[in-house]
Amino acid sequence: MTPNVTSVRQTILDAILTKFRAMEADQPVSDPYGITWSTVALGPLAGFDQRKRYSLGLVPVPEKETFQMPYVMCFLTVNVEFRVTRNQDDVSPGHLAEQALCVIKRALTEDRTWGQRAIDTKIAGSEVDLVTYADRSVEGVCMATIQYRYNYEDPRNPTPDLG
């Protein structure tokens, strides 16, 4: 038998990764995103991501838990790091950063429960790292807090034990 080592937390992170990986610049047709992410990974951006047009890294940071029988209530902060490499005819790096932040915030709030896996998702803030207007690439981060819960006895189980 294959062991089940997938926590509720991991299913939420996987849902977020799936959302960003599925993004296409021209989709949905009625209201396109305008961005297709070249690389999306769990973890911080790496040096090789500088060669990509749009890079995204999902970085979970310290999580707070409170015990509320029969649940453990969790508040997970996730940093969504991004890097955009500027092409010759693009708008300014500052505008590219704002566009990327808009797309990230839109994705994080379209389904705040991540398919009923979480209770809520809230944007906690954002930051852009721009040195000069002539920068070839721009980086930034959008912080989100995801509230979810799991069974008091099992982090894989989102259902309370009422027995």
Region spans (language model):
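Extracellular/virion structural assembly segments
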Residues: 11, 71-75, 83-109
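Short, charged, solvent-exposed linker or helix-capping segments at domain edges/interfaces
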Residues: 91-94, 155-163
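Small/polar-rich, solvent-exposed N-terminal microdomains that initiate assembly or binding
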Residues: 1-70, 115-119, 158-163
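Glycine-rich, aromatic-bearing surface loops/beta-hairpins
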Residues: 116-153
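Short helix-to-loop capping/linker segments positioned immediately adjacent to catalytic or ligand/cofactor-binding
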Residues: 67-68, 89, 131-135
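Oligomerization/assembly interface segments of phage tail-like spikes and tubes
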Residues: 71-88, 138-154
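Generic structural signal for alpha-helix termini and adjacent loop/cap motifs
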Residues: 110-114
